[in-house]
Structure formats: C-alpha cells, structure tokens
Swiss-Prot record:
Function: Regulates the dendritic spine distribution of CTTN/cortactin in hippocampal neurons, and thus controls dendritic spinogenesis and dendritic spine maintenance. Associates with the striatin-interacting phosphatase and kinase (STRIPAK) core complex to regulate dendritic spine distribution of the STRIPAK complex in hippocampal neurons.
Bias kind Low complexity: ranges: 337-348, 381-392, 1620-1634
GO cellular component terms listed in the entry, alphabetical order: actin cytoskeleton; cell cortex; dendritic spine; FAR/SIN/STRIPAK complex
A Pfam entry, by short name: CortBP2
Name of the featured protein: Cortactin-binding protein 2
Gene name tied to this protein: CTTNBP2
Repeat region (ANK), residues: 705-735, 739-768, 772-801, 805-834, 838-867, 908-938
Length: 1659
C-alpha cells in the first residue's frame, strides 16, 4: 500500500510544494499510514476527495452525453488513448469560474468511469439477448402449431379420399344408367331406320314428280325461245328505225346551222363596213390566224407571258408548258371561224345536257381545237373537258369565263374556248373626281409613276427576275422604259401639284393603301414610295415599277404564296363561290393566277381599284389593275373577249385590245413594228420598241380611238382613265364593239361597281344589249356581281329582259348559283315564270347545277312589301338563312310558286324533277317533292317518269315520297273502369308506323302487319331493351307471353274491317287515300270470344298461365287467388269469370256472374243468403239447375276464413244431393242444402301467406299463389313498363342508354329491392305487388317526374305499410293482453327507433340506390322522401347482446336460434354450451365495429349524435326479442356486400354512417349475417324431424326446405356443409325452439313454404 500511495504522490500537482516534497521523501521509505503526520493525513484526505469529485464529474458528464461522446469517439473526433482531453474540455466548458479546481487527472478514475459505462452496455446487451431468446421460444411454439395444422391437413386429405370414393360409386351408377340409355338409343335408331325407309319411298315419288316437272319446263323453254326470237326481230327493226330518225335529225341540225351561219355572215358583213380598224397589225395577224385556224391539226397559236426573248411557237407542246396561254382570236367576219365555232360548241356540249349551247350567253365564233391540244391542256389542271359544261359547270355568261363550281379549273376557259364571251358590265351611281384637274394629266401621272405590279415589255411582272438571260432587245427596251418614265414624270409634275380649290372626292379613301386593293398580284413585294394624300388631292402616285427602279427585284415567290396573299388581302370582298384557279407549280416565272373568290370589290363607289397587273387566268369578275388599263393601244387580243376570263384585258373584242401582263403575251420587241402604237400613253407604258425616238423627238403622240379606250377602261376597272375619257366632248359612251359589248356591259360583266356607277351617272344606256341579246344586267347576274346588279336595278334596268335564247337575268343567276343576285332580282319583282326557247325555267337552271340555295330562293322567297327599296340590312339578312344556320324555309312557309311552274317541261319533256333525279341531286329533288303539286308521274317524250331516270338514291327518295305513314295500334277493347287495377291499363297502344307506298301490294301489306305485330310482341316480352329490328322472328314463333298473329280478332283500316290476306280491288295506297284511313287498329281476341289474348296484352300476364288458371277454375270449381296486395288478384278473377261466362254461353248455357266484396262486417249469414239467392245452394228437394253461376268473393283477407267458410267446406268439396248440409235460415227454420256442379267459386286474398286457423281452409280449395318473385308477377312490371315506353315512343324501342330506359329500369329495381329487403326483415305483410308501380310515368326528357311520383308512392303507400308491419311484428310478444292495435297506437321508443332505422335503410338501399338522376338533383329530391334522415350509426352501434334483466342466456338462444338456422352462416360457438363466451365476444366485436364506424364519420356528427345514440341505445336495449332480431337484420342489411351500399348514396350526409367494417370482421359479420338471411332451395339442408312435425299442414321434408326469399348473396359451399352439420348436432335439443318461432311468428312459418306449388295438397 505504501508503494501505491507513493506512486500517487507525484501526480498531486495541485498540492503545496512542501507537501509535495514531503511526499517525495516518503516515497523512499515504506508507506505506512500510521506513521503519517496530521498534515500528511490532511493532504491524503484532500487527494482522495479530489478523486471522488473527479469521478462524480465523469459520471455526470457520461450520463449527460454518453451517446454523443461515443459517437464522436467512434468517428475519430476524440481518441480513446487520451480520455483526459475530453474530461478537460468538458470541465472547462461546464465551469465558467476560473478559480474552480481542476479535475483530477488520475487515469484510474477515468478508467473506472469507462468501466461503469461498459457495465451498462453489458446489461443492455443481456436484455437484448433475453428478448431474442423469448422470440426463439415463440418461433418454436409457432412450429408446433404448424405441425398441428399439418395434421389437420392430413385429416382433411383423408376425408377428401372418402369423398372421392363416394364419387366413384356415383360414377358407377351413372355408367349403369348410360348403358340403359344406350339400349334405348339402339331402339330409337331402329325406329329411325324404319322412318328413313318410308322417307326413301317418298323421295322416289318426288323424283318421279320432278321428272314430269322438268319435261314441262323443257316445253316452256322452247316456247320462250320462240318468243325471244320474235322479240329480237322486233328489236332489230326498231333500231333501224331509230338510226334513220337520228340521221334525219342530224341532217336537220346541219341545215339549221347553215342558216345560222349565213345569218351571222350577213350581220358581220354589215358591221364590217361600219368598223374601220386604225392599225394595220391586227389585220395582218388576222390573216395569220385564219391560216392557223383553217389547219385542223395545228396547235392553237398563242402568245405566252413567260416567253421573254423567243418567238411564240405554234406547237401544242408549248401549250402544255404554259398553262396561261390564249388562243389567237379568229376573224370576226370569217365564215370559217363561224363554222369552227359552231363545231366547237357542238363538241363542248355534253350528251346529258338537254339545252343547246346558245342558251347560256354563249356566242357563235369559236376557234376549232385539235385533239392533241385539248389533251395537253387537260394535263395542266383537273379540267373535265375541252370546254366547260354550259349546263352544269360553266356560268352561262358570255365567254364561259370562270365556272362557278370547282369542276373546271381556271385555265380551261383560256385554252379551251367556248363561244366568245360578251363583256358584262356593272353600273355605278355617282362619280365625282377633281373637276379642276385635267383628267388626262391626272391619268398620265397616275400611269407613269412606277408600280411594283406593272409588266415589263415582255409582259412579265417584275416581281420575279427572269429565269434566263434577257435578250439584247429586252435590255434596250428596259432602258428605254426607265428613261421614258423618268422624263414623263418630270414633265407632268407641274400639272399634278396639290390644288387647294379641288373638291374632295366623297367616300374615296387614299388609294395608296396597297393592302386593300392589291389582292391580285402583290405578294411579298414591298411597294416603294407609297404616298398617302389628303382626300382633296389627286390620286397618289403609285409605286414605281421595280423594272424601272434601281433596286433589284425580289425573287419570285412560290405560287402558293401568291394565292394565299391575295386571299389574305381580300378585305371587303365577297366571294361568289367561283372556281379557284390552281395551275401547276411549274408555272413560268412571271405568270400569275388569281382566284376570283379573293378579288376585292371596292367598298366605296368612287374608289378606283388599285393598280395590279398580274391577272393571268382569273375567272370572270376579277378586278383588273388600273395600271394595266392605262396601257392602251398595245397588241391586239389573241382571242375574242368573252372567251377569256372577265378580268383579262383581251376579253373585249376590240381591234386594239389592252395589253396586260400575261393574258396577252406580246411578241418580242424585234417583231413589233415601230408604228404599231402611236399613242403617247401607249408609248410611255413600255410596250412599243420605238419608245426612245418618240420621246427624244419631243412631239406629242396622238391617243388611240376614244370609244375603244372607254371600253378597255370599263372592262379593267380603270376609274382614272374612265373619268378622263368621260370628260372629253363628243365621246359616244354607248359605243358597241363588233360583239355588241358596250362599256357599261364590260364593266358590269367584270364586276367593276365604280365604273358601272360612273357610266350610269353619265347616262349610259342601261338596257343596251349585245348581239346575243344580253344586257349589262344579264352579265352582272350571270357573274354574281350583286353590287352591280343592285345598281343596275336602281337605274331601272329591265329585270325581265330575255336574250335571244330567252335567258333572263334571273335564269342566268340561277344557272350559276348566285343567290345574292337571285334575291335582289326577286325582291325587285322579276318574273319567275319566264322560259327560254328550250323551255327551261329558272327552276330548271337551278336544279341542273344542283344549287340548293337557288332553288329554295325561287320556291320560297317572297317579294317584300316595300317594293324595290333595298337596305343594307335587308340585303344581308334576307328572308331566311340559306347557309343552314337557321330553320329551313320550307318548314316555316309555303312555296310561292305554282304547281304548273314546278311541273313545267322543257322541249324534251323533262321537268325539273327529271333533271334532279337523273343527276342524283337528292337535296334538290327533296325540295321539289315538298311542293304539294309536284307530279312525279309526269312522263317525258320518251315516256319516262322521274322514277325511271332517277339514280338509286333518288329512287329511294321517290319511293318513300308519297308513302303513307299510318300508325298501327293494338286495341284490347273496352275495359270496365271499375275493374281493379285497370285504370293503369291503356285500351290502345301504338306499336309502329307502316309506310304504305303506291306499289305496295296487299300481300306485302299483310306480311308487314303480321311481322310488325310479331316483332312488337317479341320486343315487349324480351329481357332487355331490344329494338324491333333486332328481334328476328317469324309469324309462327310466339313471344314469351304467348301472343302472336293468331291472337288477332280483327283489323280495321280506318273504319273498314279487314283480315290478314284479304285483298281489295284498289291497292293499299289508293284504298287508304280514298277512305282517309288515319290509323290501322288491331283488336285482340278477348273474353267475349272465350279467349284471353287481350287480357294477356293488357296485364302482361303470360297467356299460358292465364289459360292454366282458367283450366283450374273449370276443373276444380273452387279456386282462391292470393298474393301480396297489388298483385292484380281481382283483375285476374274478373277477367277469368268473364271469359268463362262467354265460353259457357257459347256452349249453350246461360251464365251469371255474382260478385261480393267481403269486409270486416261480412258475416256467415250474409254469405249463406248470397249462395241461396244466386242458386248455388239449392234445397235437396229441388232438381239441379242447368244455369251456370260464377261467385266471386273479393277481399277475403278482411275476414276470418275459418269462421266465414267453415260450414261450407264439406258441401263445397262434395257437390251432390247425397251429401247435404243443414243450414238455419233467418226465420229460425233449418233446411238441407247442397252445392250443384254448375257453380264456380273464386276468391281473392291480398295476403302473401295464410296463418293460424285460416290454414284449416287450405286443403278444401285450389290455391293460386301470386308470388312477387315468381311468374307471372316477377316479369309483369318489366313487360308492362316496356310496353308503356314503346307506346310513348310511337312504336320505337329506345336504346338501353336512353334516360327513359334507365329511369324505367330504376323503378323496376326499386320494386324488387324493396320486396327483397322486406322479406329479409320478416315482414311479408308489407310486400307489394306490381300494381302500385304500373302508374310509373314515362316522360322522355323529364326523369324528375318519375322521382316525384316515386316520392309520393313512398310517402303514401310504402311508408305506412312498413311502419304497420314492423310495429305488428315487434309487438306480438310484448303486449299479449292489449293486442296489436294498442301497440300500434302507442309504440314504444325502441319500436319507433326500429321503424325509423328500417325506413332509412329501405330508402337508401332499395329506393334511392340506382337512381339515374345526377347526385345534385337526387339530393334535392331526397327531402321529398319521408324517413330518410334517421342516423344509421345507431343501428350499427346497437348492442346485439343487450337484454332485459329478467332474460337468461338460454331464453335468448331459444328466441334467435331458428332464424340463425335458416341463415347461410352458422357460428362455431353454437356448438359450445357456454353462451356467455359468445356474448362477450360478440359484444366486444360490436363495440370495436362501432368505434371504427365512429372514426369514419364526421366529427360534427359525432358531437351532435352522442347523446342521441346513447339514449336510443338504451331504449333499443329495452325492446323485445323481435326488436333485437330486427336490428340485427338491419345491421346485416347495412353491412351486406352484395346488397347496394348505402355509402354510395349518402356518404356525404352527416346523419348517415358507414358500415363497411362490420363485414370486414369475420366473426362479427357471421354473427350478424346469419340472422334471417334467406337461402335458395339447393343450398339449404332439409329441416330436422321435429321441425317438420310443428308445421301447420303436413308437408314432406324437402318441401319445407324452401326458403322464404331468394338470396342475392353468394354462398360458400363450406358454410353450407357446416350449417348442415350444426343442424344435425342441434337436432337433439328441446322443441321449445320451434314452438317459440311458431307461436310468435306465424307469417314467418308460412314464408318457409314460399316455393311450394299451390296444387300439392290435392295432387
């Protein structure tokens, strides 16, 4: 110890120095405590105290931070080799006072602390080890349990082997039966052989007959061959005559053409002397063209825009490459040209067209076309022919410019020339330009300022640079043009400065707005120098031509972009549905194609069209650029004007036609004569190669002929040039060219409204006609320029003017489908009845092109009362909407045209209906057919009707056109209003509508009626919503209800009787029309005929069952019908009595029906008097009566059967004088009576089952039970409601997805679910028959009506019955002395709670569940149903084992066991004697379930319902045993998985609870599900012997095994086996169990025999 102490001394650094020195010296000696001095002992004591303090500090630090310190040390933050650092850190951190003594740094104390911690860790690990050992023990126990399960498995396997052995025995028995059956099969085979032998004999006989028949056929074929030979001879002769007729007709046509040619030659020679061409070049080219035309194989001579340096080639290949070319105009005075034109017109007319080609504004001079050129032209676009169809695809406007439909592309009118087009004009009202400014100077400045769209000298728009090098001549011309433009612009700038005194142009917006007017040729070309000037200034200078500017032109955009941009810039333009010109993408650069649809029409009358030059192939009506129109005096047109599109410059037949960009392709400059153009404007426009010398000479150049320029300006819409020309003196504004086209005509034809207004204001002749008789109004109407038409009408143009062919403006507008023009003309009062020389009317024209809108306007548009005053709103709105936006006009008004007008025939005898039918225009034909006066049987000159020439679609339309739609109805005769339940039966039902056509025969009509009836019977008796077309059946197959065509008594066509197969002299159609039959009525055979077909149809009870009931009455005489209230017992009995009466009367007996209604006061004495007075009971002394008597006793349930019928049972069963019965009369006398054989007794009971003493009566009658879940009641409601739906839909069966079908299915499911739930509750007296649901309203589109009806039914019928039934059941035991009535009047609180819970569950599970209404609407209607707000959590939380104090466990077991026995599940605890264990277990589970349900419900509901739940729980626990069973049954209904789930309906309501967990717990669900759950017959084991003896009537064991209600729940086989085993084990228990159930629930005992047949006691 001295050594240890010495070893400690050097570590005491905190001791004083003297003490340290003394300790060091003492270390040399042996350490002895006794030798220490007092000071040394003090020092030692202080050292030990310091060590204790250090240890305490270490312990506290380790306790406080044991986990953190060890974690830090583990991760290397502190080293275990030096724990002193940690101690020092903790000490310094914990002690803020520096004077505190440092901790002892003795390692022993530190190690002790570490060891203490290690001990703790060791203890913890030992505890974990102990836990692991316990888990090991549990694992071993589980292994033992697994072994036990394996043993059980082996036992089950052994049992399985036993079952297999039993199955083998069954198989052996089946094998024996198979052997027996095989023997029978051999016998049958032998019989079959005999039959086959007989069949062979019959076949031999038939073969002989066939041979004879074949011989007869051979003779008949020989006769037919002879007939065919004669017919072929006749055909040959007819064809020869036809060929001869055709030759004569062709010769006549040739002669007519020669006459026309001679006439036109004379006219042309006369005009030729008047016209003096001023240029020599046209004559020169005219001669060239004559040569080219006369050669039939040459291609059309063309000038192409794309040709910049080369001369025009005269090959057809060039035509193929350049789609925008034009044939050279032939000489107007040449007979050869006229002949060629005539031939071409004949070529162009399609064979189906029944007009001549002259009828559509088509001229007479046309160049001939070689076939090769035609073929190549077709390659450029989807052209349908060489020329447009004048009657179908082309506007009948002079020149066939642009077809209104997409049948012909825009290139066709150029390359394939129909007769020349006569330029059509459009008038303008006022034109005021600057009067102070010289129009010539203004026009010149307007012209010479560059424009991006102007063509260069080769006709190319300079938007696209040429794709190849420009020739030297072209370059020279380019320089010359630039120089000319610069010079003239400078020279004219003096005259065109702003003038202060110039009046403003009214309504003219700045013309520099390129986006509005450059719709035609400007795409992507940015205009340079667009100047916006004030309205008082002259027109602004257009942009310079890119060809003349110093900036290079942008590249040529793609064609698609051109079309789109022109369409995008089309502001204020109205499309007229014209052809979209779509040339191929390989167009030469510089060519342009315009869509007429996209052309703008100026919105202001004074607004001149913006210059745009790229008008290559535009259809008629295009805006021609102002720039182009100023280039007067250029090369002449290549073709007559009307053969070109209306907007092309060459459309005017003038010697010096305006040259414009690509429609006329000028020859290269080298081929032009210097003197070809002598006009300054022409020279400056860049078209003449001699531009530079003329400009340098400084002399003025004279302008060309003013009338020619006037027409050019009008045709191309150049308002500026037109104003300049109109201001000159001496100008003839009515001058006509050689084709008769005036300036007004050209402007109107091309749709230039401003030009038309200017010309009309200048007093141009508004009705000036061309050589074919077409006026400007004709041209504007044909082209669809409705603004021009409106102007011309306003200037009193002749709206009924007829051209040479008789075409009026209305006819031309109808021909081209221009509905705006048609509307304007009709409102102006034009005559619709004017006919052409071919006999065509405007209706013919509209129908010929298939234009429905035009036809509707002609037939229905009425002339407004305000006459010719048109407002903008009226012109836009019209009388009705033709675009389909509104109702069809024919639906609102009657046609305004007469029948004669509609039926008018043309020269060939064709009416408009003929044309529409032959071309397949079904819509047009349908509109014509809506006119009541249309004669579809009208025949043409070939004796063909409209039907004969119609296409298949139109034939179908015509066949159904005059078809009579007559409803077919089924009548069941008169039903007595007093009949029970007959208020809901309809006497007549419409089953379908028959279409009777003119060609319908009586055989077809008979088949249609029979098939319609059979289909209807099949449809209403099918299981689903099958349409009449889906029902495939024939007349011989009966429907499920037994009705067929054999059930018909008679058929009336209107008021005329008719039978199937009967024929009249007239056809069915004529017969119906003559007799004005509005319906066909089928009467079914009824009781008056001794049949029950009408009863079957009225009540939907199958005919076979009704016949069985009638047979029972006839055979047994005493029959009682019973079933739930509303099962139609009284109706069935009355109809059977009526049928029986008529059968007896037909057999020669007199018969009488006596009916008595039984009530509570009906006594046996009254019944006796009834029998005696009706001669059913006759005295023994009296002889039998031959009269038949039928007694009906209704409402027998209101009286006691045993008391009422007890004395009559014996004589009723033994009807003879040998077994009399003595009855005492009212006077006290007694006499013997007996029932005779001619008396029939029928009764009705509105009860589902008999009980008590009434069962004594059962064996003396034949009973017919009308069960709700068996036929006929089960399917009656479904069939009845389906028939009601069919009647509501006029014979059509709606699809299953229709809301009406859904609401009807819901009503049907409500009835079934309601009865199912009531049966489960053990209240059969509350069951409902289908009678209450027959009045279910069927209102398509109004499902709410049905829901409201259901709420009234629930509140008025169902709720009182359920309350009464539950109260009567719950009060049977509780108040035996007071009786049921007292209990019903004063129900206890527990009974009230049970009733409310039952109503709430029934409402949610049976009624509201499955309602097709949306959830929001259903919530609104929920308040209409009474009893739906009861908190269902009370039912779920009800303590199933709560009982009164005086009750024992055995008593409860006796009460509930029978109901459990009839259930599907049986508790394993039944086999145990200790019931308290079961009760505790069930109680615990019930409380657990309640808690889980409470957790699912809302907190607010819990707070509100806690007290209510507790109070009602106590009340329920005070109730009777039946109440407890009712509540258990309610719990099982709530938790049942197969029943409808309440949570789906009312999970959002606060007062409803979920019950899902009840079914999830196996023990609890078994406990509540096995209560009163019905089972099907196959699943229930036979009842034990003591149960059988307790039944009221002796029935076999198997009969009693039938359950009350069919279960909708799946039954596991293991549970059924378990049930049977438990039944056997409990069979030795006392009989009190069955006695209890029989005494307290008689109706339940009756329900056990539900599926039993009614006739068993008497069998």
């Amino acid at each position: 110890m001295a050594t240890d102490g010495a070893s400690c001394e050097p570590d005491l650094s905190r001791a004083p120095e003297d003490a340290a020195g003394a300790a060091a010296e003492a270390a040399k000696k042996e350490f002895d405590v006794d030798t220490l001095s007092k000071s040394e002992l003090r020092m030692l004591l202080s050292v030990m105290e310091g060590e204790l303090e250090a240890r305490d500090l270490v312990i506290e630090a380790l306790r406080a931070r044991r986990k953190e310190v060890f974690i830090q040390e583990r991760y290397g933050r502190f080293n275990l080799n030096d724990p002193f650092l940690a101690l020092q850190r903790d000490y310094e951190a914990g002690a803020g006072d520096k004077e505190k003594k440092p901790v002892c740094t003795n390692p022993l104390s530190i190690l002790e602390a570490v060891m203490a911690h290690c001990r703790k860790m060791q203890e913890r690990m030992s505890a974990q080890l102990a836990a692991a050992e316990s888990r090991q023990k549990k694992l071993e126990m589980e292994k033992l349990q697994l072994q036990a399960l394996e043993q059980e498995h082996k036992k089950l396997a052994a049992r399985l082997e036993e079952e297999r052995g039993k199955n083998k025995q069954v198989v052996l028995m089946l094998v024996k039966e198979c052997k027996q059956l095989s023997g029978k099969v051999i016998e049958e085979a032998q019989k079959l052989e005999d039959v086959m032998a007989k069949l062979e004999e019959e076949k031999k006989k038939t073969n002989e007959l066939e041979e004879e028949l074949s011989a007869e056929k051979q003779r008949s074929t020989e006769m037919e061959a002879q007939m065919e030979k004669q017919l072929s001879e006749f055909d040959t002769e007819r064809e020869q005559l036809r060929a001869k007729l055709n030759r004569e007709e062709a010769h006549t046509t040739d002669l007519k053409e020669e006459i026309d040619k001679m006439k036109k030659m004379i006219e042309q020679l006369k005009r030729g002397s008047d016209s003096k061409p001023s240029l020599s070049l046209p004559r020169k080219t005219k001669d060239r063209r004559l040569v080219s035309i006369s050669v039939g194989t040459e291609g059309t001579v063309t000038r192409s825009v794309a040709c910049q340096t080369d001369l025009v080639t005269e090959s057809a290949d060039h035509v193929k490459k350049l789609p925008l070319t034009m044939p050279v105009k032939p000489s107007t005075g040449s007979p050869l040209a006229s002949a060629n034109a005539k031939g071409s017109a004949a070529m162009a007319r399609p064979g189906i067209d029944r007009q001549t080609s002259h009828g559509d504004l088509i001229g007479v001079s046309v160049p001939a076309f070689p076939p090769s050129s035609a073929n190549r032209i077709e390659e450029n676009g989807p052209s349908t022919g060489l020329t447009p169809d004048p009657t179908s695809s082309t506007p009948p406007l002079p020149g066939n410019a642009a077809p209104p439909t997409a049948q012909t592309p825009g290139i066709t009118p150029q390359n394939s020339q129909a007769p020349p087009m006569h330029s059509l004009h459009s008038p303008c009202a006022n034109a005021s330009l600057h009067p102070g400014l010289n129009p010539r100077i203004q026009a010149a400045r307007f012209r010479f300022q560059g424009n991006a769209n102007d063509p260069d000298q080769n006709g190319n728009t300079t938007q696209s640079p040429p794709s190849r090098d420009v020739s030297p001549t072209s370059r020279d011309n380019l320089v010359a043009k630039q120089l000319a433009r610069n010079t003239v612009t400078q020279a004219l700038s003096r005259f065109t400065g702003p003038q202060a005194g110039a009046p403003p142009r009214p309504g003219a917006p700045p013309t520099g707005d390129v986006s509005t007017h450059h719709s035609v040729g400007r795409t992507g070309v940015k205009t340079h120098g667009v100047a916006r000037v004030d309205r008082g200034n002259p027109p602004p200078i257009p942009p310079k031509k890119p060809g003349l500017s110093q900036t290079p032109s942008p590249p040529h955009p793609q064609l698609k972009v051109i079309i789109d941009s022109s369409r995008a810039s089309n502001t204020g333009a109205k499309g007229d549905n014209k052809t979209v010109a779509s040339p191929p993408s390989s167009l030469p650069q510089g060519n342009r194609v315009i869509n007429e649809e996209n052309l703008p029409k100026s919105s202001s009358p004074q607004l001149p069209p913006k210059p745009s030059i790229d008008l290559t192939v535009a259809p008629a009506g295009c805006t021609v650029s102002a720039l182009a129109t100023s280039q007067v005096g250029a090369w002449p047109a290549a073709t007559p004007g009307l053969n070109q599109p209306a907007c092309s410059g060459s459309s005017l037949a003038i010697p010096t036609t305006i040259a414009f960009c690509s429609s006329i392709n000028p020859v290269s400059a080298s081929s032009c004569r210097p003197g070809a153009s002598d006009s300054l404007l022409v020279t400056a426009s860049g078209w003449s190669p001699s531009l530079t010398p003329l400009l340098m000479s400084g002399g003025p150049a004279p302008l060309a002929g003013r009338p020619t320029l006037l027409q050019q300006a009008a045709a191309q819409g150049n308002v500026t040039l037109l104003l300049m020309l109109l201001n000159e003196e001496g100008l003839d504004i009515n001058y006509s060219c050689e084709d008769g086209h005036s300036a007004l005509y050209s402007a109107a034809k091309n749709g230039h409204t401003d030009c038309v207004r200017l010309l009309l204001s200048a007093e141009a002749q508004v009705n000036a006609a061309d050589k074919n008789g077409f006026t400007p109004l004709c041209a504007a109407a044909a082209q669809g320029h409705f603004e021009c038409v409106e102007l011309l009408i306003a200037y009193d143009a002749n709206i009924n003017h007829a051209a040479d062919g008789g075409q009026t403006p209305l006819y031309l507008a109808c021909k081209n489908g221009n509905k705006e023009c048609i509307k304007l003309l009709l409102e102006a009062g034009t005559d619709r009845n004017v006919k052409t020389t071919d006999g065509w009317t405007p209706v013919h024209a509209a129908v010929d092109t298939g234009n429905v809108d035009s036809l509707k306007l002609l037939m229905y548009h009425r002339v407004p009362a305000h006459g010719n005053s048109f407002s903008e709103e009226e012109s836009e709105s019209g009388v009705f909407d033709l675009d389909g936006g509104g109702e069809s006009p024919e639906g609102k008004s009657k046609p305004v045209v007469t029948a004669d007008f509609i039926n008018h025939a043309n020269r060939e005898g064709w009416t408009a209906a003929h044309i529409a039918a032959s071309k397949g225009f079904k819509n047009c034909l349908e509109i014509l057919c809506r006119h009541g006066g249309l004669e579809t049987e009208r025949r043409d000159k070939c004796n063909r009707t409209v039907h004969d020439v119609a296409t298949d679609d139109c034939k179908h339309l015509l066949e159904n056109l005059n078809a009579l739609k007559i409803p077919l109805r089924i009548s069941v005769g008169e039903i007595e209003p007093s009949n029970y339940g007959s208020d809901d039966f309809e006497c007549e039902n419409t089953i379908c509508t028959l279409n009777i056509r003119k060609q319908t025969s009586w055989d077809d009509f008979s088949k249609a009626v029979s098939q319609a009836l059979t289909n209807h019977f099949q449809a209403i008796s099918s299981d689903g919503w099958w349409s009449l077309e889906d029902v495939t059946c024939n007349n011989s197959t009966d429907s499920n209800i037994g009705l067929s065509s054999r059930s018909i008594r008679s058929i009336t066509l209107g008021n005329v009787p008719w039978s199937v197969g009967q024929s009249f002299l007239q056809s069915p159609w004529d017969f119906m029309m003559k007799n004005k039959a509005e319906h066909i009525t089928v009467l079914l055979s009824g009781p008056q005929e001794g049949c029950l077909s009408s009863v079957t149809y009225a009540s939907m009870i199958p005919l076979q069952m009704m016949q069985n009931y009638l047979r029972l009455v006839e055979q047994y005489h005493n029959v009682i019908f019973h079933g739930p209230e509303g099962s139609l017992q009284d109706y069935i009995v009355r109809q059977l009595a009526l049928c029986l009466k008529h059968r007896q009367m037909a057999a020669g007996f007199s018969c009488e029906i006596v009916r008595a209604e039984v009530d509570a006061g009906f006594s046996k004495k009254q019944l006796l008097d009834l029998f005696i007075s009706s001669a059913c009971l006759i005295p023994v002394k009296q002889s039998p009566v031959k009269k038949k008597i039928i007694i009906i006793l209704e409402n027998l349930e209101k009286s006691s059967l045993s008391e009422l019928l007890r004395d009559f049972l014996a004589p009723l069963e033994n009807r003879s004088a040998e077994s009399p019965c003595t009855f005492q009369k009212g006077n006290g006398m007694s006499e013997c009576y007996y029932f005779h054989e001619n008396c029939f007794l029928m009764g009705t009971i509105a009860k589902a089952c008999l009980q008590g003493s009434d069962l004594l009566v059962q064996q003396h009658f034949r009973w017919v039970q009308l069960r709700w879940d068996g036929e006929p009641m089960q399917g009656l409601l479904q069939r009845f409601l389906r028939r009601k739906v069919v009647n509501k839909f006029r014979g059509q069966v709606p699809p299953p997805c229709d809301p009406v079908c859904k609401i009807v299915d819901w009503a049907l499911s409500v009835w079934r679910q309601l009865n199912s739930c009531l049966a489960r509750l053990g209240t059969p007296e509350a069951l409902l028959g289908p009678k209450y649901f027959l009045s279910c309203p069927v209102v398509p589109g109004h499902a709410q009506v049905t829901v409201k009806w259901m709420s009234k039914l629930w509140n008025g019928v169902i709720t009182p019955r359920v309350q009464e039934a539950i109260l009567s059941r719950a009060s049977v035991k509780r108040q035996p002395g007071l009786g049921q009535t007292t209990a019903k009047r004063h129900p206890s609180q527990g009974q009230q709670a049970v009733v409310k819970a039952a109503l709430s569950i029934l409402l949610n599970k049976a009624v509201l569940h499955g309602c097709p209404l949306p959830r929001a609407e259903l919530e609104q209607h929920r308040a209409d149903f009474k009893g739906g707000s009861f908190p269902l959590s009370i039912v779920a939380s009800y303590n199933s084992c709560s009982k009164k104090k005086g009750e024992s466990g055995a008593w409860r077991k006796v009460n509930t066991s029978p109901r459990r026995k009839s259930g599907r599940f049986s508790l394993p605890t039944w086999n145990k004697p200790d019931l308290s264990t079961e009760g505790i277990k069930s109680k615990t589970l019930s409380q657990l379930n309640c808690n889980r349900n409470a957790s699912l419900s809302k907190q607010k509901s819990l707070e509100n319902d806690v007290s209510l739940t507790l109070n009602l729980d106590q009340r329920l626990s005070l109730g009777s045993d039946d109440e407890a069973d009712l509540v258990k049954e309610l719990q099982s209904m709530c938790s049942s998985k197969s029943e409808s789930d309440i949570s789906k309906i009312a999970d959002s309501r606060d007062d409803l609870r979920m019950f899902d967990s009840a079914g999830n717990n196996p023990v609890f669900s078994a406990a509540i599900n096995n209560l009163r759950m019905p089972v099907s017959q196959k699943e229930v084991c036979p009842l034990s012997s003591h149960q059988t003896t307790e039944c009221s009537n002796s029935k076999s064991k198997t009969e009693l095994g039938v359950s009350r209600v069919k279960s909708f729940l799946p039954v596991p086989r293991s549970k059924v086996t378990q049930c049977s085993q438990n039944t056997k084990r409990n069979s030795s228990s006392s009989n009190t169990r069955q006695i209890e159930i029989n005494n307290n629930s008689k109706e339940e005992n009756w329900n056990l025999h539900k599926n039993e047949h009614l006739e068993k006691p008497n069998k």
